[in-house]
Amino acid sequence: VDAKTLKLKKTIQNAGQWVTGLMWSEQTQRIYVANGGGEILILDPKRNRIEKRWKPLGDKPALLLNLAEDSATGRLFVTDNSKAKTTLVLDIHTGEIIKQLDVGDSLAVKFNAKRNELYITQRESGKLLSLDATTYAVKQTWDLPPNPNSLLLSADGQTLYVSVKQPSSREKEATAPDDVIRIAL
């Protein structure tokens, strides 16, 4: 999409099942795309084409959702909320698995370089986790029921904003508004 005119420039075909997450990497100058088929696609934004496809969990069922980057170490964090219920730590250049974080259901992920922390929302469990980004040990857990969802980090890395969704479905709409929680780190 042209950023000035908002007109469609090109459609990239064969992006897999359910494109779920996008992330721009300043380090690699590429766009990383997660999809419901368990793939990470690497896009060249100048040529508008898929350069690589990674399937980090192989043939295991995976619904890769959201992505975050540690540009200093070249790590790519990817959440999975399917049967694997994990967060993957990948080499951003090769797609090789560095570590699989078996923290349970994982939705949003955000890396905080200033504090060397990783934040993961667990929508089903109603929790937010803070992990040490070197050891991957859980440092803190916040109960944020019913469904913590998206994450936004302040520019100074000292405040985390979490959207908390209310339960809803096609059969039953939410009975209360969603919330945004501010956490001083």
Residue ranges and their predicted role:
Residues 1-185:
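Predominantly soluble domains enriched in secretory-pathway, periplasmic, or organellar proteins
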